[in-house]
């Protein structure tokens, strides 16, 4: 008599495996507005809240990349074993956003913190009922590793036969889409601490130092070409010629006068802004004292 045995198989079931190929998530493309919104909501959170959550809005590109362009916070209460989300507020905010831009739909949700926790699975289940295969974005506002780490996850279900046991979060690549001006601000904000933001004069000094460095690099390149050390590049030569031709033909004395006039304007603006800050600080103290009386 042949012996028979039955085996129970544990398997991962990804939500994307049941969806079409166009909805499989490859990369989360995040625009800087989303990160700044998350940080702003975290700063304004109630004192009792350890983290904030919110809805991510955007679209799914043909290659499966999730383009995250906007977000809004959603009030919630969280304990060790349960999570309460203000669903009415979420739906009202979504309706308001759709009136402004109907092309932006729900693509996932975000939370602040170093990673996922027990409550993340419950919140992710809610958003999975709102949209197939949602993205979970985490922003480390506590600077655990010395900077604000940004991660994105998708969820896979660990099932025992037909029974779903637990959700497994799998990290996916994150692409921060920023222009140079946005990246400068982001690099300053993501640091643990900032000693001092440069004022206008310090910014001008840094710009001039960088300009001098670039001019020296051009001099070295031209000297190397003339000396036969490197082969000439016609494209670089035309670019340098166009840059030199775009400079106004001014006598040195006139140029010095223009720079000095601009410097005087900067000093005047700094003086006026200092007076304004002093006046605002004094008015705030007087207003506080009047309310206490």
Swiss-Prot record:
GO terms for molecular function: metallopeptidase activity; translation initiation factor activity; translation initiation factor binding. One of its GO terms (biological process) is pollen germination. Disruption phenotype: Male gametophyte-defective. Disrupted pollen germination and embryo development. Hypersensitivity to exogenous sucrose. The modification N-acetylalanine is found at residue 2. Expressed in inflorescences, leaves, stems, siliques, roots and seedlings. Accumulates at highly levels in pollen grains, developing embryos and root tips. It is found in: Cytoplasm. Keywords: Acetylation, Cytoplasm, Initiation factor, Protein biosynthesis. Gene3D superfamilies: Cytidine Deaminase, domain 2. It comes from the Eukaryota. The keyword Repeat does not apply. Transmembrane segments: none annotated. SMART domains: JAB_MPN. InterPro entries: eIF3f (IPR027531), EIF3F/CSN6-like_C (IPR024969), JAMM/MPN+_dom (IPR000555), MPN (IPR037518). The keyword Lyase does not apply. GO terms for cellular component: cytoplasm; eukaryotic 43S preinitiation complex; eukaryotic 48S preinitiation complex; eukaryotic translation initiation factor 3 complex; Golgi apparatus; nucleus. Residues 28-159 form the MPN domain. It holds the Pfam family JAB. Component of the eukaryotic translation initiation factor 3 (eIF-3) complex. Binds to TIF3E1 and TIF3H1. Belongs to the eIF-3 subunit F family. PANTHER family: EUKARYOTIC TRANSLATION INITIATION FACTOR 3 SUBUNIT F (PTHR10540:SF6), EUKARYOTIC TRANSLATION INITIATION FACTOR 3 SUBUNIT F-RELATED (PTHR10540). Component of the eukaryotic translation initiation factor 3 (eIF-3) complex, which is involved in protein synthesis of a specialized repertoire of mRNAs and, together with other initiation factors, stimulates binding of mRNA and methionyl-tRNAi to the 40S ribosome. The eIF-3 complex specifically targets and initiates translation of a subset of mRNAs involved in cell proliferation (Potential). Involved in cell growth and differentiation, especially during embryogenesis and male gametophyte germination. Regulates sensitivity to sugars (e.g. sucrose). This is Eukaryotic translation initiation factor 3 subunit F.
């Amino acid at each position: 008599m042949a012996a028979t045995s039955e085996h129970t198989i544990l398997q991962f079931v990804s939500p994307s495996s049941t969806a079409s190929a166009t909805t499989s998530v490859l990369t989360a493309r995040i625009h800087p507005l989303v990160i700044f919104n998350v940080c702003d909501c975290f700063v304004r959170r109630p004192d009792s809240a350890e983290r904030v959550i919110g809805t991510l809005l955007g679209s799914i590109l043909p290659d499966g990349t999730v383009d995250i362009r906007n977000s809004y916070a959603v009030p919630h209460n969280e304990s060790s074993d349960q999570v309460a989300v203000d669903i009415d507020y979420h739906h009202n905010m979504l309706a308001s956003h759709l009136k402004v831009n109907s092309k932006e739909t729900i693509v996932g949700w975000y939370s602040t913190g170093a990673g996922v926790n027990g409550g993340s699975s419950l919140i992710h289940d809610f958003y999975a009922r709102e949209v197939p295969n949602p993205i979970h974005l985490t922003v480390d506002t506590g600077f655990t590793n010395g900077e604000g780490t940004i991660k994105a996850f998708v969820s896979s279900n660990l099932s025992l036969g037909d029974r779903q046991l637990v959700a497994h979060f799998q990290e996916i690549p994150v692409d921060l889409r920023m222009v140079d001006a946005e990246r400068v601000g982001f690099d300053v904000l993501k640091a643990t601490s900032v000693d001092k933001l440069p004022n206008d004069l310090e910014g001008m000094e840094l710009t001039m130092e960088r300009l001098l460095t670039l001019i020296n690099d051009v001099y070295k390149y031209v000297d190397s070409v003339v000396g036969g050390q490197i082969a000439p590049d016609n494209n670089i030569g035309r670019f340098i010629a166009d840059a030199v031709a775009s400079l106004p033909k001014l006598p040195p004395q006139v140029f010095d006068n223009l720079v000095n006039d601009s410097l005087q304007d900067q000093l005047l603006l700094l003086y006026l802004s200092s007076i304004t800050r002093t006046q605002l600080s004094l008015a705030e103290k007087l207003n506080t004292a009047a309310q206490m009386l």
